[in-house]
């Protein structure tokens, strides 16, 4: 097996396990640092179209919408200065939570989502297609987003290359991915977390360096790659104390805006936040 980014065959095996598939290993390239699964054979054709990402018993879309509402609002607030009177495409739009907020300001919103039941649910609320190739010829967008999608793609480079076809000359691409340098993995080395966080749907995990490499290989220009911490200190303390998720709910009394900002700023400074947010544009 070769590294997706640099074609090296020199891998180390990361500690931990893939939570839903014990046949897979987590490989880290010793040349460039990309983290990838040892195989992609478990993802069959039609996997995402048939709600395979959600397991054998997908939760109702209404429950899914409630669970993503906080992130949908965060992303809207993060990008709202870019939205007024702009044409927006959200690739892998999921339940459409971000787009439904974005259409308050944008001149038009479009979603790309392979999951059939979601398209049926959203078809009367927003314009939605199953793939980029289904867009009308000549379609152009001022903002293209992909939130926690790139890590699911077997060939993310080709998708980023496709984005270029639909991006307006002065447009922007914003992608958000989980970070392979998450402090729970690389600083605290939480063993329970190492057996919890890796997932068979996440084919790749990027750090700031490997994400920049992917962007450059796709012929795009990096405006910025930002460290962002989604989970607060209470979550991390709970993992370290109890070895379980949910600390941001059970121990929320520990959190305050000042404490969380100070903790997030510290993790950002050392490059070990749990999330990366990249702003991209076309090359000159």
Predicted features along the sequence, with ranges:
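Feature marks short, surface-exposed loop/turn motifs that line or immediately flank catalytic pockets
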Residues: 118, 181-183, 229-232
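Conserved N-terminal segment of class I S-adenosyl-L-methionine
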Residues: 1-147, 156-162, 227-228, 243-253, ...
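A SAM-dependent methyltransferase catalytic signature shared across enzymes that methylate proteins
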Residues: 4-12, 208-227
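Histidine-centered divalent metal-coordination motifs
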Residues: 148, 152, 202
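Acidic/polar helix N-cap motif
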Residues: 152-155, 207
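Short, glycine-/aromatic-enriched active-site segment of Class I SAM-dependent methyltransferases
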Residues: 175-204, 209-214, 235-242
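Surface-exposed loop/turn positions
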Residues: 86, 170-171
